[in-house]
């Protein structure tokens, strides 16, 4: 953002009207590729495309030609003798659109970034990086969900039509050429709907090509879906809620246009009394969201069908009611962010002593509990070829070409990261099985590499292998509690939420 301020001397009140000319500035592509502002990002592609003779710092002509070629209809030329030539011709057209989309992704974020900075000026929360952490959600759930009764488990509807997405962006960006260019880019990538559905194969293609643009569009679409919660929250609660404000800071877009507020105030003013619930809490991660309340099942059913009608009328999306499940927190485990969370009744015995008599009172306290889901973890380990579907450890043949220390470090890093992520769970017995699978898989991989037996490697590297699979908190607790039994019992009860986890990596690719 600091780099943009040095180059973008645009009036904030009119900056959304002048986005298209920024597409011809070379530093935009330098920012998109993170190559710095002094390097020439288009230097090598210019030579490859036959633009020799032009100044490599003057990119306007290059960008114009890229846009022209992207607009032109091209047909594939098939060569019978050279199948690789076909891929080259097809890749050349994708290269033009990819170059433009990478620069366009930086430009389209400018109005939202500047609006974000202006809306959060003078607030201390902008200096906090802990809200970026995934684990920052769980302390909020522990504080709030233990007092709630019901929860709506929501899957965000998909897919949205491309033209409707552009119409929604038109409310924020009044630059017509930029919107026309975005329309061309979206139709160049026919797999846009696959991004919404989170299909792994198609999503991996986008993550390698234009992750920034499509994640921006997806976040904008999700924000539009969530805008109704912000509006109803402001209408039902006159005092600004700190927890609600903290939720808003964890998203990328914070304000809704005034026209939206006016329309909903006029249309739904008579029905707002149905949804006045001061104990409503909302949490989202990726395509799944949670709406919890202290209200009755009747109120939750009203919310369910209200959301279905809202998405259908505002986005022209048919969201099936079965994508929203109503569950009671006391007898249902919530699958969210890889944890199984629920609200359990914990009974504590209190002894009251008087002058004459003593009384023993059983007090039931609601407690938010999180456990480690062992079945999904074993499924992930089996997918990554660390074990079979039954959880039996197997060797990792793909890693046998690495050195012994590198193999041990890879297995140990995965084990430590899993322990680090599930450090806030109240019951960690499942992690011991995961550690056993990874440790024995590591030993099988080493024995396969050296054509030896697993027993010999466990005897020779037993202590080193054990130290590598210890987490940092285990090492600290082992120093405080020398006895292994007391340390294990203390570690099983210890709950630590780390605020340095900002994303979840795929276990199969985390090496």
Curated annotation (Swiss-Prot):
UniProt-recorded Gene Ontology molecular function terms: RNA binding
GO biological process, one term: RNA splicing
Keyword Protein biosynthesis carried by entry: no
Signal peptide start-end: none
Highest taxon in the source lineage: Eukaryota
Compartments reported by the entry: Plastid, Chloroplast
Pfam (any one): Intron_maturas2
One cellular component (GO) term of this entry: chloroplast
InterPro entries tied to this protein: Domain_X, Maturase_MatK, Maturase_MatK_N
Keyword field: Chloroplast, mRNA processing, Plastid, RNA-binding, tRNA processing
Keyword tRNA processing carried by entry: yes
HAMAP family for the chain: MatK
Function: Usually encoded in the trnK tRNA gene intron. Probably assists in splicing its own and other chloroplast group II introns.
Entry similarity comment: Belongs to the intron maturase 2 family. MatK subfamily.
Protein name in the entry: Maturase K
């Amino acid at each position: 953002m600091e780099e943009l301020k040095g180059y973008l001397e645009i009036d904030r009140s009119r900056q959304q009207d002048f986005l298209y000319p920024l597409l011809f500035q070379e530093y935009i592509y330098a920012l998109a590729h993170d190559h710095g502002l002094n390097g020439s990002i288009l230097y090598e592609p210019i030579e490859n495309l036959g633009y020799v003779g032009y100044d490599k710092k003057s990119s306007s002509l290059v960008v114009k030609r890229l846009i022209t070629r992207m607009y032109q209809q091209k047909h594939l030329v098939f060569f019978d003798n050279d199948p690789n030539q076909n891929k080259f011709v097809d890749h050349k057209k994708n290269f033009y659109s990819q170059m433009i989309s990478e620069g366009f992704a930086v430009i389209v974020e400018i109005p939202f970034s500047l609006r974000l900075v202006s809306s959060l000026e003078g607030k201390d929360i902008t200096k906090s990086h802990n809200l970026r952490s995934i684990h920052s959600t769980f302390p909020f759930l522990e504080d709030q969900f233990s007092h709630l009764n019901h929860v709506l488990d929501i899957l965000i509807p998909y897919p949205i039509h491309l033209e409707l997405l552009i119409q929604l962006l038109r409310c924020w960006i009044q630059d017509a050429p930029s919107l026309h260019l975005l329309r061309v880019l979206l139709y160049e990538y026919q797999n846009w709907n696959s991004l919404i559905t989170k299909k792994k194969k198609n999503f991996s293609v986008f993550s390698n090509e234009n992750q920034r643009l499509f994640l921006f569009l997806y976040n904008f679409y999700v924000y539009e879906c969530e805008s109704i919660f912000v509006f109803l929250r402001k209408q039902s609660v006159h005092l600004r809620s700190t927890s609600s404000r903290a939720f808003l800071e964890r998203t990328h877009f914070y304000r809704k246009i005034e026209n939206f507020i006016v329309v909903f105030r006029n249309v739904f003013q008579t029905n707002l009394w149905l949804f006045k619930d001061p104990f409503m809490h909302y949490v989202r991660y990726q395509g799944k969201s949670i709406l919890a309340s202290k209200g009755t099942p009747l109120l939750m059913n009203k919310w369910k069908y209200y959301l279905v009608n809202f998405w259908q009328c505002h986005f022209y999306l048919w969201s099936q009611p079965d994508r929203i499940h109503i569950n009671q927190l006391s007898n249902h485990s919530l699958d969210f962010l890889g944890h199984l969370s629920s609200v359990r009744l914990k009974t504590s015995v209190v002894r009251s002593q008087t002058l004459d008599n003593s009384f023993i009172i059983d007090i039931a306290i609601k407690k938010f509990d999180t456990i480690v889901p062992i079945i999904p973890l074993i499924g992930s380990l089996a997918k990554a070829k660390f074990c079979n579907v039954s959880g039996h450890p197997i060797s990792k043949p793909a890693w046998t070409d690495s050195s012994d220390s590198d193999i041990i470090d890879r297995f140990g890093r995965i084990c430590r990261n899993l322990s680090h992520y599930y450090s806030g769970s109240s019951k960690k017995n499942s992690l011991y099985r995961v550690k056993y699978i990874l440790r024995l898989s590591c030993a099988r991989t080493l024995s396969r590499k050296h054509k030896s037996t697993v027993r010999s490697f466990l005897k020779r590297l037993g202590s080193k292998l054990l130290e590598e699979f210890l987490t940092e908190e285990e090492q600290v607790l082992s120093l405080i509690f020398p006895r292994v039994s007391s340390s294990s019992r203390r570690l099983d009860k210890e709950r630590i939420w780390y605020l340095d986890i900002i994303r979840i990596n795929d276990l199969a690719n985390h090496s």
